[in-house]
A protein has these predicted regions:
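Internal transmembrane alpha-helices of multipass membrane proteins
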Residues: 1-60, 123, 132, 137, ...
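Alpha-helical membrane-protein architecture signal
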Residues: 4, 93-96, 126
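Juxtamembrane/interfacial segments at transmembrane-helix boundaries in multi-pass membrane proteins
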Residues: 27, 58-118, 139-171
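Juxtamembrane helix-boundary/capping and inter-helix hinge elements in multi-pass membrane proteins
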Residues: 39-45, 73-74, 116-126, 151
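Short, surface-exposed, polar/charged, turn-prone segments marking secondary-structure boundaries
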Residues: 50-51, 126, 156-157
Length: 171
């Protein structure tokens, strides 16, 4: 399951296709679910269930967010190029939904409740990649979205978005 997780991680960072990203995101989540539940104790099972429910729910919101703005486009570059055709309300909802999907995996507040349970429940050989790589995949998604979707905002709104994110990084 560890190699499956790492393969999905590699596919996520190298793809420009939203369908591939979504499918590999789910592969990463379910493979890491199996790794967290590996010990087969009640603590590990509960932690794994909490992890998969929270991360899958948020990932489904992320997929909805991409569908809201994607339309007939599946390439990330095409979606970003066509952001101007959508109303501000659609863009706001799509951004929030998509950020929630990435934020849950990154363990950002208030979607971080799975972290304290999953790390001690997982074997030590899994806990390190879980904290060192998997959670950073969520950060990768947040940074990618902010750099591509928020670049056209006026400077004060862009600064507000980043200033709102900074306390989350510290907490």
């Amino acid at each position: 399951f560890l190699l499956l997780t790492f393969g999905a991680l590699l596919n996520i960072v190298t793809t420009d296709n939203i369908g591939t990203l979504a499918s590999q995101w789910e592969v990463m989540t379910w493979a890491s679910f199996a790794l967290v539940a590996w010990e087969r104790t009640s603590k590990a099972r509960d932690a794994a269930i909490k992890y998969v429910v929270l991360c899958c729910s948020a990932a489904y919101l992320m997929i909805v967010g991409f569908f809201m703005i994607g339309g007939n486009h599946t390439q990330y570059g095409e979606i970003v190029a066509n952001l101007s055709v959508h109303s501000d309300d659609v863009l706001k909802f799509a951004l929030v939904f998509t950020l929630l999907g990435f934020a849950a995996k990154a363990g950002l507040v208030p979607l971080h409740s799975w972290l304290p349970d999953a790390h001690p429940a997982a074997p030590s050989s899994v806990s390190a990649p879980l904290s060192g790589v998997l959670t950073k995949m969520g950060v990768f998604g947040v940074v990618t979205l902010c750099n591509s979707w928020l670049e056209d905002l006026p400077d004060y709104q862009n600064a507000d978005a980043y200033n709102t994110a900074q306390p989350t990084m510290v907490y």
